[in-house]
Curated annotation (Swiss-Prot), chains A, B:
InterPro entries noted in UniProt: Kinase-pyrophosphorylase, PSRP
Residues binding ADP, per UniProt: G156, V157, S158, R159, A160, G161, K162, T163
E.C. no: 2.7.11.33, 2.7.4.28
Family: Belongs to the pyruvate, phosphate/water dikinase regulatory protein family. PSRP subfamily.
Coiled coil spans: none
Record's keyword terms, sorted: Kinase, Nucleotide-binding, Serine/threonine-protein kinase, Transferase
Name of this chain's protein: Putative phosphoenolpyruvate synthase regulatory protein
Role this protein plays: Bifunctional serine/threonine kinase and phosphorylase involved in the regulation of the phosphoenolpyruvate synthase (PEPS) by catalyzing its phosphorylation/dephosphorylation.
Higher taxonomy: Bacteria, Thermotogati, Deinococcota, Deinococci, Deinococcales
Pfam family, one: Kinase-PPPase
Reaction equations catalysed: [pyruvate, water dikinase] + ADP = [pyruvate, water dikinase]-phosphate + AMP + H(+); [pyruvate, water dikinase]-phosphate + phosphate + H(+) = [pyruvate, water dikinase] + diphosphate
Organism expressing this protein natively: Deinococcus radiodurans (strain ATCC 13939 / DSM 20539 / JCM 16871 / CCUG 27074 / LMG 4051 / NBRC 15346 / NCIMB 9279 / VKM B-1422 / R1)
One function term, GO molecular function aspect: ADP binding
Length: 277, 277
């Protein structure tokens, strides 16, 4: 039983990239926070031979006393059948739900590799890549003229989270997000920064705890005025006042991930009818 | 039965962002390609009251003859219980597998909202944000000195897919990816471009069908020499020859998504032992 105490092996087996399988596995395993785990990813396991290679790995680990887990999103009968012979608990993540859907739709699922292809819906894929080009071109206010083409304009002080959020919105959701970095000039004005005036309905404010901002900026430019706690407090206070005056929707990014900030932006776009669903 | 013929409503209900729930739903529904669907996302449904609001929506749609589906990753008993009262097939995506895991680990899962928090593992999150800064700083070869700090260096002609791939690797996987854009000078040399010489083991080549490259570049600079089919054919041919001469791992991006290209890079990093799992 040499395996006791070792992080338990978690195999992620997919006939494609394995991103979905790993997401589900992590969503499940996060509910057992005390368990030490190690992930072993086996993407593109798309035939019985590849599955058998995984089974052999699992057997070797089991023989040395480890207790592997297998999570798979494959829908190929021969791959599933092979995996079921491994000395491990197999989490077949799709099959049971496919059976339920077969009943709902009164038609059999189309099984086999390649069914879930990221580029299958290639119009959606192209719009993601276009949105990414867009976000890169307009990053940090260098593309004022493109505000008119934006789905959303993220407004906030430097390093409040605008760039990661806009890239994430583009890559994951095909949303065209621009940034407007608030700076000294903007705080001396009462109303909106001039380039934003006609796009008020697209604005989304990002705020952040000044101490967190201070830490982030210090990593970038240690000892600078830009990174000082006084400057950070001043900028965040003025930005918050501006957001309040304009009645902008605001998200605090201090302890939010890009996924969470993006979810807030998407919810806003949906509420205002600019995005379906 | 006014609902017949309408795209069928697919509710995505999560106590968090809903990304995992939507990924699973899409992985399942892609096996029924002929079914018209519309997605209705209800993230942050984290208590019985919020769940009841979703149930009311479902009831209204069902009353007008539609047949909604509900996909949920919630693990909160009160939310699940409420959803089960809706006139819709509910796909409870985690519960059954949590029960299996409870048996495997011989301990009960920690249920409730916030269990699956993107920033819970904040070291991993910070490394993703750092990798993103890194990718942005080194995009398109402007950061030669940072090649030493890179996990991988993507090499290819302009618009072969380097930038989206490096951003995706950073945002999703915390991988530090740099780019090296191959240009005229590089093709006149026999060996590696000078800045890359000492980092050969980190190189990953991206190639693309010249006609596809021509189409992409034409969108960007119509009628230019840069976009001409002759120039595209020349560059791709010379790049491929260079990759072959150096024995680099190469991925054809012509009909691959960033997810797929990234999976190829990750597989390489794992094979060479530079990345666990």
């Amino acid at each position: 039983m040499s395996g006791w105490g070792m992080p338990r092996p978690v195999f992620i087996v997919s006939d494609h990239t394995g991103l979905t399988a790993e997401n589900i596995a992590r969503a499940l395993l996060t509910h057992f926070p005390g368990q030490p785990l190690r992930y072993l990813r086996r993407p593109f396991t798309s035939d019985a031979q590849a599955a058998q290679a995984v089974v052999s790995e699992v057997e070797a680990l089991a023989a040395s006393g480890e207790r592997p887990l297998i999570f798979t999103t494959t829908t190929q009968p021969d791959v599933l059948e092979a995996l079921q012979t491994a000395p491990a608990q197999v989490f077949d993540l799709l099959t049971e739900n496919l059976r339920l859907l077969e009943g709902e739709f009164a038609e059999p699922p189309q099984l086999g590799a390649g069914g879930h292809h990221d580029m299958q819906d290639s119009e959606a894929y192209l719009s993601r890549m276009e949105a990414l080009d867009f976000a890169l071109a307009t990053d940090d206010g260098i593309g004022d003229k493109q505000y008119g083409l934006s789905d959303v304009i993220l407004v906030g002080v430097s390093r409040a989270g605008k760039t990661p959020t806009s890239l994430f919105l583009a890559l994951q959701h095909g949303i065209r997000a621009s940034n407007y970095p608030l700076a000294e000039d903007d705080f001396e004005r009462e109303g909106l920064p001039a380039p934003l005036e006609q796009y008020r309905s697209k604005l989304f404010g990002l705020t952040i705890d000044p101490r967190r901002l201070h830490a982030i900026r210090t990593q970038r430019k240690p000892g600078s005025k830009y990174a000082s706690i006084e400057q950070c407090e001043y900028e965040v206070r003025r930005a918050s006042a501006l957001f309040a005056r304009l009645g902008l929707p605001v998200k605090d990014t201090t302890s939010a991930s890009v996924e969470e900030i993006a979810a807030g932006v998407l919810a806003l776009l949906r509420q205002s009818g600019r995005l379906e669903g």
